[in-house]
């Protein structure tokens, strides 16, 4: 007998969390159930062609309890899923939206725990601001843990969350020809998201890093040579790469199928977001990936003193960019929050992490993965092993129904 399930995402939920929620919703729909998905208007594009009913919730936030309880009654919902539990609590609790009604609902409430909160750090560290994770967000018994990011052995609720390759012929040769790449050229793909734009940051230190980090990357990676091209997939062209001339190409935001084709045409993914869904796509595509992170904090003088061999270029850049804060998700932070999640996690073996300020390691790691076939093959082998381990896990619908 089919059932109706309600999914609730906070309006500020990122594309990654909503995309993971949609993966579960589509699996339930494929097995005959119905899903009503409440989410912000900004993510409506994700629902196109999915067959999942999306209802914008932006105008209902301050009457959420009444709205949700009435909807559950009207639609006779069998369950409520929070997409994801962290964004629901961190977005709604600070603005005074009461969430204690969730504990009193007569139906199961399931927490999509995108970050595996019981393993993560206790604070949502945003550089200078580090609000604690609300205890109720950690308390849900019914949790769905997508892999990645959770460890495959994290316990009940884990499910395979790697994207699947669509049934399409290989596109590498055709796309590389379209991009004007020669046989000796190497293509680095750099995806960015709207939430990373400088003008959308709420804190000055985030906006400064959103502007300045691409400047440092462009200057440092120029050392890779004329054979290396960069393809930027994102909402807005970056002026930081102007010195690359025609070797920098801006693609804009693209549909998932096009992104998959571009990744298959690329030789390296360069990311500043450790947990980006584009990184998951790279694992599926067998695309070597470098993730840039920063574990250092301090003023320009403090950071230079800690690196006696700092180049003149790094010193000049720090004069504009510092003070820095640690990050695993640029420009926000979350270094302390995510570090425990990545410890002893096989997901962390599917990419090479490099420090923002270690210019030699950044250049040489990228150079090896672009030009040394054995280095690229070794990383692909780790991706292959991880893929097989994830594929052995329960699917999203199976994990979901395990909590009903």
PLM segments and residue spans:
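Conserved catalytic-core segment of nucleotide-activated headgroup transferases in glycan assembly
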Residues: 20, 24-27, 164-243
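A nucleotide-sugar donor-handling region in carbohydrate enzymes
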Residues: 122, 126-197
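Catalytic binding pocket for nucleotide-activated donors in carbohydrate/polymer assembly enzymes
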Residues: 277-381
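Short, flexible/disordered intra-domain loops and linkers
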Residues: 87-95, 121-129, 196-211, 300-308
């Amino acid at each position: 007998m089919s059932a109706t399930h309600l999914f609730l995402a906070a309006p500020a939920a990122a594309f990654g969390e909503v995309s993971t929620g949609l993966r579960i919703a589509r699996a339930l729909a494929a097995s005959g159930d119905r899903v009503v998905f409440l989410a912000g208007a900004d993510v409506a594009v994700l629902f196109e062609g999915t067959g999942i009913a999306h209802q914008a919730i932006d105008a209902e936030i301050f009457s959420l309890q009444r709205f949700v309880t009435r909807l559950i009654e009207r639609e006779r919902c069998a369950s409520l899923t929070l997409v994801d539990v962290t964004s629901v609590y961190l977005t709604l609790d600070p603005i005074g939206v009461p969430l204690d009604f969730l504990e009193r609902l007569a139906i199961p409430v399931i927490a999509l725990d995108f970050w595996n909160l019981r393993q993560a750090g206790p604070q949502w560290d945003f550089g200078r601001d580090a609000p604690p994770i609300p205890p109720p967000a950690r308390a849900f018994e019914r949790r769905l843990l997508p892999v990645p990011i959770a460890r495959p052995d994290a316990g009940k609720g884990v499910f395979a969350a790697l994207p699947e390759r669509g049934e399409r012929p290989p596109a590498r040769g055709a796309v590389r020809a379209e991009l004007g790449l020669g046989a000796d050229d190497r293509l680095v793909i750099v995806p960015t998201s709207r939430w990373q734009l400088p003008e959308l940051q709420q804190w000055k230190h985030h906006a400064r890093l959103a502007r300045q980090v691409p400047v440092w990357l462009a200057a440092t990676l120029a050392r890779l040579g004329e054979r290396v091209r960069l393809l930027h997939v994102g909402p807005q062209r970056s002026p930081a790469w102007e010195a690359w001339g025609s070797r920098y190409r801006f693609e804009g935001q693209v549909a998932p199928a096009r992104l998959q084709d571009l990744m298959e045409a690329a030789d390296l993914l360069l990311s500043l977001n450790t947990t980006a869904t584009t990184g998951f796509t790279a694992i599926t595509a067998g695309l070597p990936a470098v993730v840039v992170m920063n574990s250092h904090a301090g003023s320009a003088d403090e950071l230079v003193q800690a690196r006696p061999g700092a180049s003149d270029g790094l010193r000049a850049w720090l004069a504009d960019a510092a003070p820095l804060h640690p990050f695993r998700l640029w420009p926000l932070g979350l270094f302390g929050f995510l570090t425990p999640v990545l410890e002893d996690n096989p997901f962390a073996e599917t990419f090479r992490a490099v420090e923002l300020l270690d210019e030699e390691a950044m250049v040489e790691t990228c150079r090896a993965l672009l030009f040394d076939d054995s280095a690229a093959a070794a990383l692909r082998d780790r991706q292959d092993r991880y893929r097989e381990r994830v594929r052995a896990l329960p699917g999203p619908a199976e994990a979901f129904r395990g909590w009903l």
